[in-house]
């Protein structure tokens, strides 16, 4: 962002650059429309400079970023879009722990712990 030019919000990325169209999708790959929603962050169309392969391991790149959802680039991040259209990364979708059959993101647990005023910072490893 450009200082004093780009409007910013704490904990949020700025608005998308021109030509980059982020979308949120559910587990089935259906686009989640509207604001005030959460889902998996994908990029709808290719853009200059986008990752297309990894040297020496094209298949790994294809599987990780292009095979999860048809015709979308999947970042691997969970994300929320607020009322103003700003995006906040909520954590990696593959960074989860299983507690009694419930999949819980480690970032969610860290955020809950960090709500306590006596906790400066926490890290959860599962």
Regions found by a protein language model. Name each.
Residues 1-4, 20-22, 50-54, 97:
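Adenylate-forming
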Residues 23-45, 50, 83-84:
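Conserved beta-loop-beta connector loops within the AMP-binding
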Residues 9-16, 32, 64, 69-70:
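Short Gly/Pro-enriched turn/cap motifs at secondary-structure boundaries
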Residues 25-26, 67, 75, 81:
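Hydrophobic alpha-helical segments, especially N-terminal targeting/anchoring helices
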Residues 47, 52-53, 71, 78-126:
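AMP-binding/adenylate-forming catalytic core of the ANL superfamily
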Residues 1-10, 26-28, 56-60:
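Active-site loops of AMP-binding adenylate-forming
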Residues 19, 60, 118-121:
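Glycine-centered tight turns that cap/initiate beta-strands
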